Amino acid sequence: MWKLKIAEGGSDPYIYTTNNFVGRQIWEFDPQATDPQQLAKVEAARLNFYNHRHKIKPSSDLLWRLQFLEEKDFRQNIAQVKVEDGEEVSYEAATAALKRGVHFYSALQASDGHWPAENAGPMFFMSPLVMCLYITGHLNTIFTEEHRRETLRYIYYHQNEDGGWGFHIEGQSTMFGTVLNYICMRLLGEGPEGGQDNAVSRGRKWILDHGGATAIPSWGKTWLSIMGLCDWSGCNPMPPEFWLLPSYLPMHPAKMWCYCRMVYMPMSYLYGKRFTTHITPLILQLREELHTQPYDQINWKKVRHVCCKEDTYYPHPILQDLIWDTLYLTTEPLLTRWPLNKLIRERALKKTMKHIHYEDENSRYIVIGAVEKVLCMLACWVEDPNGDYFKKHLARVPDYFWVAEDGMKIQSFGSQHWDTAFFVQALLASDMTDEIRTTLAKAHDCIKKSQVKDNPSGDFRSMYRHISKGAWTFSDQDHGWQLSDCTAEGLKCCLLFSLMQPEVVGEAMPPERLYDSVNVLLYLQSKNGGMPGWEPAGESEWLELLNPTEFFENIVIEHEYVECTSSAVQALVLFKKLYPLHRRKEVERFITNGAKYLEDIQMPDGSWYGNWGVCFTYGAWFALEGLSAAGKTYNNCAAVRKGVDFLLNIQLEDGGWGESYQSCPDKKYVPLEDNRSNLVQTSWALMGLIYAGQADRDPTPLHRAAKLLINSQLEDGDFPQQEIAGVFKMNCTLHFAAYRNIFPIWALAVYRRFCNPNSEAISKPSK
């Protein structure tokens, strides 16, 4: 049976940590764990997911939950409540539902204080890792038979009905998703006609029916070239010489969004080396299976710009293709021949590897994300197959695995801090401190231990990095990459804890470390008042014309986001109340400019585009709460009025809200099919309206939403998993499995606190 291990480093001599592995979560298969009741529950969960896989795509993340609830012998002692038709929401009902949710999810807290959860969904994370391990000869070392079984399960369970696989689990079939998962199945031992429900042959048919693997997007062409399944001449150039350009040039990698920079750094190294793995009999078979014509007859030059229409979200501008053609026809032939291959190319490759090693070391070999991790690991192996750099990479591979009832998948890199900071705020809003003292104290300790204590090593600015001391990451401290919203949410938690008795929640974070966090936030704010995610924004927008991907938008440079801006405004408003003299003018200016940014980016219909959640509902919650924190109200701010009207206009008959992920790529509000409600989105809308003062005007929409949340709660205090709620870069969904608990609990807590308990619809219990 699979078991989730918390804050363990194991005995691997090549792994190291900055905080004793707080937040680390790894899965191990325990052959001795054979409890028949637990095994039966796991098998039932798998079967239930399989039977409903085309209706509810994200997992309910049940394996670790079953484990933790069993280990803690959790029993729900508060009776389930329902609000009947025509009945008003009572104080007792709201309180009971809230307490049931809090007790249930508190029981799922890990030993180090964080809340584990799946954070996955893209269908292009696992295959590159499998290819990398196949190339390096470590596939059988890392992938046990149990790893193979669960990885294949995930692929089978997320195959679309037409035989293909999507860019992400909610999406239509794409060439990128289908080719990568096809290769993954074959490398893991499936034959050409193998796989559950004829998965392999159905996938191959989809590929060939849609033009074959030469129509895969550019990232796919790179991996196929590495695998010997395409020729490098079928790829657009990724010259490592970009790293030799003067940093003041607009197209220098230093100007890129960090994820873009971190993807093309190892890609450019592998391209510059023209690395291709040893051609095995299996690769020769795959050449025959994936292409519509014999491999040696393919005109690779003609397929460089070919991309399957199902994959194309961001078509390349003509200008970009002209640039690639110029590099392809003139620059690359020169740089790959003597003497420039010695004078320039080798120097560029060394410079690129210097940056790779720097980034690896400063993330403890976790690297910034799943895509980048595998590319950097392969680059280290290509440089030195027996070197310590590669061995350190191998030691951190388990950090990316996640196992649920739908199988094994690769996480983005983990949402440990993000989920924990949100749930802490939900707990504090519940006003249940006396019942959850231990839970709060452990969470407080985890958040304090997860703060980044130092900037990147050495002369970090010369490595195109920025300050991180005082920040929080998305996952854990070892990851190292600062994030503005994660920093703001962590700061909010620490400030709220500082208002509580230390004998209850532990010692408050020292003011100096709070000041470090404030420094990060002040450093990152843009001139327009908005907040970027990772690094300062402000580079020229025209650089987005050079976006080399076909399936993402706005990935070349850093941008400002409504969510990051709101989180930072909320955090600094609270900080200003508690530390009114610290950098007072800067903090006040930040809040003023941040609020103005939130007003300025509002859409004409009153909505805000959410960048990291689905979508306009998510953006509206953040914007309205941020504006409220800055002193903007329904009466004094037109943006608040328009935002409230937007949410009220899309409320559904059952009192909920339900928005399709399709809103994200379409950039317009798209309701869920059949006007279904989604509990997570209902919670966002409910909180947004409450912070906008809706309870003082007409609480009826709030009571209707609360009724839906209360009536949807399950018998044990959990909430049902519904449609995916997370997204990134407009076109790829991301499953935050913790959201289905965090946000309904938080919304009920805020509802109970701010919807006047003496009103007609929600009343205090009679004495």
Curated annotation (Swiss-Prot):
Gene3D superfamilies named among the record's database cross-references: 1.50.10.20
CDD domains membership: SQCY_1 (cd02892)
First-tier enzyme category under EC: isomerase
Disulphide bridges: none
SUPFAM superfamilies for this protein: Terpenoid cyclases/Protein prenyltransferases
UniProt superkingdom: Eukaryota
PFTB repeat boundaries on the chain: 148-189, 640-681
UniProt GO molecular function: beta-amyrin synthase activity; intramolecular transferase activity
Catalytic activity, reaction form: (S)-2,3-epoxysqualene = friedelin
Coiled coil: none
Keywords linked to the UniProt accession: Isomerase, Repeat
GO cellular component, one term: lipid droplet
Enzyme Commission code(s) on record: 5.4.99.50
GO biological process, one term: triterpenoid biosynthetic process
Residues the record marks as active site: 485 (proton donor)
Pfam families per UniProt: SQHop_cyclase_C, SQHop_cyclase_N
Function: Oxidosqualene cyclase that generates friedelin, a triterpenoid product with the maximum number of rearrangements possible. Friedelin is probably required to coat the leaf exterior as defense compound against pathogens or herbivores.
Family listed: Belongs to the terpene cyclase/mutase family.
Protein name, per record: Friedelin synthase
